[in-house]
């Protein structure tokens, strides 16, 4: 399910003749999974909230409203009259994820042969740590509450307030709005642009405002509210960044925008993106990062499926020397979730075909990356 949700974002990179038949099926993975029977739901609620769990609600819908990843969501009304979303973890989901991770770790040596530039051990350790957090809804509640406090009065971004939580149940304020998948499918260009810019602003600002980076960007986790704000859901996967975005990340972005291939290469070496025993052409490294920096080179930029397909074809063409770079670069563990967010949001923006001043938005929050005039 987690893989399917990630894949549904990157359908934008597929050629249209292949993407079209899969688009609707993949998008369903962002919000759909087989629902739990009501009796199982009641059993989980009784175990987590107590046998008198119904006393907490004035109403509770037994039929799940949405299902995704490791849990499902029920609509209810809390005892104080607040409309709430009740997220219930599938029984056995935590054990299944850990089992899957153990299977992946068995193949880590093979991955190392395919990707000789990558140090697999710290990546596996980071993945394990994040999975342990993601299956504990108390971690999620903590992250969501921090973001709610940071964005409580924000004109563009809405975070649902946490009502109560246990390790397996999370009760939050209900957010009404148009699912981002619907905006992608039939939204106006104004809606598409607004959604893209608001999501960009959220990810640019969250580390400095909340000390976190929401690290599960797929359309099922966003809603466009009637008042124009973007609603953000599911804080199970978050990167704790108490000092904001890492300075090395911003430095590398600046070197790329300056077209300073040597400084970029030196930074990659220093920060572990290129292992000591690996030697690559600095100019090819710079060229490989075009999808990251091109949207920040012009006053406005329009993301599109065609653009993403072109970029994917360029770095995936074995005849192109740039394609080999992806197999030679390392991904330090502390950048795994930042990379996930960068790739995921790029896919979303291309699905939306969003257009806007992404460069100016980035410079508001990261003025130090401004290229040398």
List where the protein language model places each region.
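Broad phosphate/nucleotide-binding scaffolds in NTP-utilizing and phosphate-metabolizing enzymes
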Residues: 1-204, 211, 225-231, 235-243, ...
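Conserved phosphoryl-transfer catalytic core
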Residues: 259
């Amino acid at each position: 399910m987690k893989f399917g949700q990630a894949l549904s974002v990157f359908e934008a990179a597929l050629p249209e003749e292949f993407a079209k038949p899969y688009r609707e099926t993949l998008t369903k993975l962002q919000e759909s999974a087989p629902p739990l029977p009501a009796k199982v739901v009641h059993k989980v609620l009784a175990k987590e909230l107590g046998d008198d769990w119904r006393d907490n609600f004035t109403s509770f819908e037994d039929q799940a409203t949405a299902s995704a990843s490791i849990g499902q969501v029920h609509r209810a009304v809390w005892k104080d009259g607040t409309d709430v979303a009740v997220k219930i973890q599938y029984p056995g989901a935590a054990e299944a994820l850990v089992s899957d991770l153990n299977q992946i770790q068995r193949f880590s040596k093979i991955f190392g042969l395919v990707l000789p530039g990558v140090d697999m051990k710290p990546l596996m350790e980071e993945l394990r740590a994040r999975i342990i957090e993601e299956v504990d809804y108390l971690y999620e509640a903590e992250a969501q509450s921090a973001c709610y406090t940071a964005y409580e009065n924000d004109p563009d971004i809405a975070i649902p307030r946490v009502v109560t939580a246990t390790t397996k149940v999370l009760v939050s304020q209900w957010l009404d709005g148009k699912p981002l998948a619907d905006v992608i499918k039939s939204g106006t260009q104004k809606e598409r642009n607004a959604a893209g810019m608001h999501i960009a602003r959220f990810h640019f600002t969250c580390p400095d405002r909340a000390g976190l980076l929401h690290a599960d960007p797929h359309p099922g986790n966003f809603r466009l509210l009637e008042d124009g704000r973007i609603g953000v859901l599911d804080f199970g996967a978050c990167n704790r960044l108490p000092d904001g975005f890492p300075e090395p990340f911003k430095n590398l972005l600046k070197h790329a925008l300056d077209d300073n291939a040597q400084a970029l290469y030196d930074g990659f070496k220093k920060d572990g993106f290129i292992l000591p025993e690996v030697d690559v052409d600095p100019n090819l490294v710079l060229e490989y990062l075009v999808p990251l920096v091109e949207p920040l080179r012009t006053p406005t930029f329009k993301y599109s499926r065609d653009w993403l397909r072109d970029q994917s074809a360029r770095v995936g063409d074995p005849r192109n020397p740039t394609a080999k770079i992806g197999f030679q670069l390392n991904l330090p563990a502390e950048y795994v979730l930042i990379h996930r967010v960068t790739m995921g949001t790029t896919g979303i923006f291309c699905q939306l075909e969003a257009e806007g001043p992404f460069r100016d938005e980035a410079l508001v929050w990261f003025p130090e990356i401004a290229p040398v005039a």
